[in-house]
Structures are given as C-alpha cells and as structure tokens.
Amino acid sequence: ISQKTYDDKPETENKIQDDAQGYGTIDFKNIGSLEYTKPVSLKYFDVEKPEKSWRVLYIDFCTLALADYPADFELMKKECLSGKTAMWLVDERHKGLLRVAKDIGSGFYVEGNRSALDFARNIRRIIDQCKISHEDVIVRYSTRNENAESEHSVSETGKAQERRYHREDKQSFY
C-alpha cells in the first residue's frame, strides 16, 4: 500500500522557519526535515501545551482534533481500513493492525511508531481533512545547537584525558 505524500516539493527543497535562538515553527504548507529536533509546544486554537516528544505531541493533537471533528476522523479511519491510505488510524477492533497503537479517545487509535516527519505530515493530513486553518495549529520545536555539539565532540572525556596524561608521563619517563 503506497502512502500519499502531502509535500509539494521534494524533502530537500523544503524550508523550515527558523529563528536565531535554535527554535523553529513547522510550516504545514511546506514541511522540511525534522532531524535532530525536539518539540517544545503545541498550540491548537486557544489551547497551548508544552511538549517533550514528537509522539506525545502527535497524540495530543489527534486527541484535540478528534474532539472537534469526529465525523472527519470517522472518514479518515474508513479510508485507512479500505486500503486507500497507509494504516495510521483505526478503531478498537482493528488496533492490532498497528505496530504501536496509541489511544486518542472515542475508540480511535493512531500509529505511534513513526518519525517526526511522518507525525508532522499526518498532522497536516488532519488539518487539511478537517479544514483547520494552518494558523490555528502551531508546533514549535528546538533544533540541535551546532556550536554546542561541535564543542562537545571536540572536548575529551575524563577517561580519554587520563589516558593522554598517562602517555605523556610515559614518554617523558623514558
């Protein structure tokens, strides 16, 4: 079963809105790479929640959207079960079809074993199906600080430093 992709451009051409502090906001019209990112918050209409993982953010979003748009979720579930789309949304009876079924309420389950990019694409799928304005769903995330990473990778661990000192002592002794 092939999965529809909702990106207009190849992933390499996608752009993510970033600001200088290492934080970004997902542009659901043009989702870019989410590698090395961690969600910070989800804003759904007037509800704003801090988030710590992409999976939990996705489940929170699905739970909120399901409460407001149950008929659309019923339609998306039927599409999944008919084989028109990849299996990502099912009911109680079919939750065994998912690798990691996550309960979102009202007898619905979503696939929880996905990448950050897949979660973002599914959120966009729900936004589009339910005709939610892109401005009403805001996902903020942090990016890995490249400077902090490079400093960390260059610095020695305690054991490595100890071995270096031992070698230097050995060389000066002989």
Predicted regions and their residues:
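Short, low-complexity, charged amphipathic interaction modules
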Residues: 1-13
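Polyanion-binding interface signature
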Residues: 13-174
